[in-house]
């Protein structure tokens, strides 16, 4: 038996061959994931991780990002990982790679070239993910890499997202 603790205990029973069975959908840990810098490695990490179907048996991922950018990355990486577009984290579907579309703005993707536009997209994703986490929509928040210089704006004056989250949540 494998037990994972985070807000609640989740048990994965094993069969005779000692292989994990799929947990009940309601038992899966919900993981909110900020997209990070749209010109960085965030989507590559996320999409490649969840292209393994076994990962979707362990958790319910919820990306906070940009659907068009995610699809661009999928196509560029040659991945067929389907995305389940949802309006809010509470609508996440177990067994799917869920994405909450944080913006309908057109975003130009240039790999390895962070800019103010990709920094603002990273901030919007992080802000919406943090708000949903604070409201209890999911169990764990994972942040994809950001450009610490390009994410800076009037609302984000921190060294990085760790400091932003510390300021936002304090000792929670």
Language-model regions, residue ranges each:
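Contiguous, glycine/small-aliphatic-enriched amphipathic segments in soluble metabolic enzymes
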Residues: 2-169
């Amino acid at each position: 038996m494998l037990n994972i603790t985070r807000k609640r205990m989740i048990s994965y029973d094993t069969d005779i061959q000692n292989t994990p069975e799929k947990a009940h959908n309601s038992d899966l840990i919900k993981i909110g994931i900020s997209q990070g810098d749209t010109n960085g490695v965030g989507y590559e990490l996320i999409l490649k991780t969840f292209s393994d179907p076994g990962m979707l048996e362990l958790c319910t991922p919820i990306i906070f990002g940009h659907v068009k950018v995610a699809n661009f990355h999928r196509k560029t990486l040659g991945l067929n990982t389907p995305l389940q577009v949802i309006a809010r984290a509470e609508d996440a579907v177990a067994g799917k790679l869920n994405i909450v579309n944080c913006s309908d703005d057109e975003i130009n993707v240039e790999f390895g070239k962070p800019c103010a536009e990709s920094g603002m997209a990273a901030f919007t994703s992080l802000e919406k993910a943090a708000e949903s986490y604070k409201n209890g929509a999911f169990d764990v928040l994972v942040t994809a890499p950001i450009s610490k210089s390009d994410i800076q704006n009037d609302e984000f004056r921190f060294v990085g997202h760790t400091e932003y989250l510390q300021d936002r949540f304090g000792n929670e």
